[in-house]
Amino acid sequence: MAEYFLDNPQIKHPDIYIAFTPDEEVGGGMDHFDVKRFGAKYAYTVDGGGIGELEYENFNAASAVIELTGQSVHPGEAKDKMVNASRLAIEFDAQIPENERPEYTSGYEGFYHLTDMQGSVEHAVLKYILRDHDRDLFEKKKDIIKKAAESINMEYGEGTASYVIKDQYYNMKEKLEDAMFLIEDAKNAMEEL
């Protein structure tokens, strides 16, 4: 598009600003993007979708990393002393709603996706991605992670489970609700092609 307008200066158009950002899938590419300096009030993202595809909403997204600390004791003397972090990881994951995992959801249904699990008796780490189109349900998913960690700590002692939840990006529809003309303009332009 930029090349076309540069090659055809006789075609009238409003000011056009173009930016390239990396790391779109996790939203990190925009962390240091100076929106004010960029100068555009609104922007479209051109991505690798199919011809005629127009999307204006997406998941709210967060990552969650849970660390579990166990207590290793010789197996012959472990009764009432050993705390197996790998088993704590299993116990933690069992508190996540079973029907809210990617293999059981579709469309607008949000999910908890366990992407990585590593563990030993002394230490275990679970990594999840949390997704939901609805902001309230997204916040509830983060609360369930927190409550699962708190439950482990209540049972096995403070500091047994720790978590870091990091918001990655939000549903862009929230920002567009007062500017739906942008979607209509894009639809009209696509239909004219």
Feature names for model-found ranges:
Residues 1-2, 44-65, 139-159:
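Short N-terminal signal/transit or membrane-insertion segments
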Residues 86-193:
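Metal-dependent amide/peptide-bond hydrolase catalytic core
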Residues 1-59, 101, 105, 109-111, ...:
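Acidic/histidine-rich catalytic neighborhood of metal-dependent amide-processing enzymes
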Residues 30-31, 79, 139-142:
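Conserved strand-to-helix beginnings and helix N-cap segments that scaffold or border functional pockets
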Residues 15-21, 67, 162-165:
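Glycine- and acidic-rich phosphate- and metal-coordinating loops
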Residues 24-27, 70-77, 167-172:
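Active-site-proximal beta-alpha loop/turn segments in soluble metabolic enzymes
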Residues 14-17, 76-80, 170-178:
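Short acidic/polar alpha-helix capping motifs at helix-coil junctions
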Residues 35, 40-91:
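Phosphate/diphosphate-binding glycine-rich loops and adjacent basic-rich segments that engage nucleotide
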